[in-house]
């Protein structure tokens, strides 16, 4: 029996459930699979396998399902720390999130923290599921909780007034009880997710960028750089910029090779070698990027959200303070940077997540949402994401 090819006719979107512990994220995930995918019971999702992303162990459950319009990959994490790590490392990229809030409790500390993280790591859109509505008899109380959630979203720069909020009960949906707050609510939620969470631009449609991994000299032909195309398409004869570490320069791609074969173009996901016109072997190095002119710029100072590994995760054994100088691993190379902690934060303990300012000793091609590892002598001690560029 031939293996069936994965039919991708529908647009693909990555989403996940976020929210406070015990508000019903996993029950809702199970309920969605019940109506839109291959049913996964609560226990199957809750026993999430451990994965390693950028040297950090994270427990994440992955399920997939589809609506009439889209195919979804959905992540759900068992513990709060897993969410923090997941969102900061981007182990599971989220194009949108379903925020689950218990109507009985209203927003709680982790509700706030997950919304803040979603803002910091650039999750584009949030849809809310107000869960456990069968535990609240007073409709005015429900309206109050909804208002609180909207205010909290607005506080962190999400459009609180416009965010869709669906009221229901994941448990009722799982147990085939009260259809109006069970199955109907889950179906309504997914139709809101379909409409409200934007379809991400495919990597191949974005401006060309390729991090340089290696540089070779080929006698009689010139300099070849190799790497995996992160996004966009590069065609032979196109002009590109070389960005980062040194002053930005321009060159023309005179050849593209893959698996030793000559191509007329390379695209997102391809591992290619690019032959560059008039570039000296000494004039280019690992850690720089090739990019469409004007699409990305080099920077040294930025604000970041970072997670610092615990000792058990192989991280530091001691806290660090302002002026900490580790290496920041961007794409393919380490660059030393100096950390400034926010006012009122005396020190950062292993296991914390923190907003910090970083100043690199050389510029790197950078944009918001770019992820990095924090390393000391080649050992990963943290992970982060650029939340804002300063200069």
Swiss-Prot record:
Keyword Hydrolase in annotation: yes
Keyword annotations from UniProtKB, A to Z: Cytoplasm, Elongation factor, GTP-binding, Hydrolase, Magnesium, Metal-binding, Nucleotide-binding, Protein biosynthesis
InterPro entries: EF-Tu_GTP-bd, EF-Tu_GTPase, EFTu-like_2, EFTU_2, G_TR_CS, P-loop_NTPase, Small_GTP-bd, T_Tr_GTP-bd_dom
GO CC terms, sorted: cytosol
Ranges for region G3: 76-79
Keyword Magnesium belongs to the record: yes
Reaction catalysed by this enzyme: GTP + H2O = GDP + phosphate + H(+)
Enzyme class: hydrolase
Residues that hold Mg(2+) according to the record: 26
Binding, GTP: 19-26, 76-80, 131-134
Annotated function: GTP hydrolase that promotes the GTP-dependent binding of aminoacyl-tRNA to the A-site of ribosomes during protein biosynthesis.
Subunit comment: Monomer.
Family membership: Belongs to the TRAFAC class translation factor GTPase superfamily. Classic translation factor GTPase family. EF-Tu/EF-1A subfamily.
Record-given protein name: Elongation factor Tu
Source species of the chain: Bartonella tribocorum (strain CIP 105476 / IBS 506)
Lineage, uppermost ranks: Bacteria, Pseudomonadati, Pseudomonadota, Alphaproteobacteria, Hyphomicrobiales
Gene that encodes the chain: tuf1
